A protein has these predicted regions:
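Aromatic sugar-binding surface patches on proteins
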Residues: 63-73, 161-163
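Beta-strand-rich extracellular modules
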Residues: 86-90
Length: 163
């Protein structure tokens, strides 16, 4: 067994260095956790970041702190996006929104102060509103009855609007 690895091996795995995880940790930062300590100098020329379309993301700076690597991008990252972080000798991991959602910058940009989230009912219609700034897709599912085993009636793709 390898810590953090759910794979069931049928032969002895290589216990080389690996990247355990990656996340969007700031508006223009990604963080990666490695299986062994590195220095910032060890990383020079070894880190690449690509977006969901495979396009390279320009890296402004790197900082290593033990087994944690902080990658600062040249521009803000899309919190709904998926990025791939690759570090030569450690492999790659997909990074999605992580600790970025607990930052002041995230709150300033995405906080919602309205009081109309959830279902808003009138005699003519029921409207549904959710706050999901990191979601790439949100679906509303309605059922044919209130029975817990009821069949799905409709699946409706919700649209993204400004706050």
């Amino acid at each position: 067994m390898i810590g953090g690895d759910a794979t069931v091996y049928t032969s002895r795995p290589s216990l080389g260095a690996t990247m355990k995880s990656a996340e969007i940790s700031g508006t223009n930062q990604l963080s990666a956790k490695l299986s062994k300590k590195v220095s910032t100098d060890d990383l020079k020329g070894k880190v690449t970041v690509t977006d969901a379309d495979g396009k390279a993301v320009d890296v402004k700076s790197l900082k290593a702190d033990g087994t944690k690597v902080i990658i600062t991008a040249d521009k803000d990252l899309d919190v709904r996006g998926k990025y791939t972080v690759e570090i030569k000798g450690f492999g790659s991991q997909n990074a999605i929104a992580g600790s970025v959602v607990r930052t002041d910058a995230f709150d300033r940009k995405y906080a919602y102060s309205g009081e109309d989230l959830g279902a808003t009912f009138t005699k003519k219609q029921t409207g549904f509103k959710v706050w999901a700034p990191t979601a790439a897709k949100v679906e509303l599912i309605t059922y044919k009855s209130v029975d817990p085993n009821a069949e799905i009636d409709q699946t409706i793709d919700m649209t993204s609007e400004s706050k």
